[in-house]
């Protein structure tokens, strides 16, 4: 239950920043090219680290990888509002934060997926996987909605 709730919150945050950071870049620069750069930097870590992430997850403590990844992502997300508050937000900072957020996610999700069978009874594995999948889909659906509401307010 705790893993599911954490996943729901984490996944919703991912969906929000996938909308909010490109929007912020567009607002900051007006450049469609730089906005595309931010969107691309969100997907590059899967290409660069996808295969090695699986190996690392198999060799090291999955729970620790998940915790480190989520703490790192939480800290990275705070960089953007702090940079805005102190007026040192730059396109490079937004791109780097986006890349790093996605990099940590590239390690988090395989760790989570491989941990589920170890913390779930075999007869509940299908239900656990279904709950994780459904919450992920709901987050992908609701995250952009929340991002849009947040953007319209600010």
Positions of PLM-derived features:
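Alpha-helical transmembrane-bundle signature of multi-pass membrane transport and export proteins
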Residues: 1-154
């Amino acid at each position: 239950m705790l893993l599911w709730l954490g996943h729901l919150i984490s996944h919703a945050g991912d969906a929000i920043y996938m909308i909010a950071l490109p929007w912020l870049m567009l607002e900051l620069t007006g450049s469609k090219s730089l906005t595309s750069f931010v969107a691309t930097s969100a997907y590059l870590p899967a290409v660069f680290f996808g295969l090695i992430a699986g190996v690392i997850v198999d060799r090291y403590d999955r729970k620790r990888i998940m915790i480190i990844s989520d703490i790192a992502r939480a800290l990275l997300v705070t960089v953007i509002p702090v940079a805005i508050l102190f007026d040192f937000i730059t396109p490079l900072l937004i791109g780097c934060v986006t890349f790093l957020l996605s990099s940590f996610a590239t390690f988090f999700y395989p760790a989570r997926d491989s941990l589920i069978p170890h913390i779930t009874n075999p007869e509940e594995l299908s239900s656990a996987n279904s709950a994780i999948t459904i919450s992920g889909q709901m987050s992908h659906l609701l995250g952009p909605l929340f991002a849009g509401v947040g953007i319209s307010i600010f």
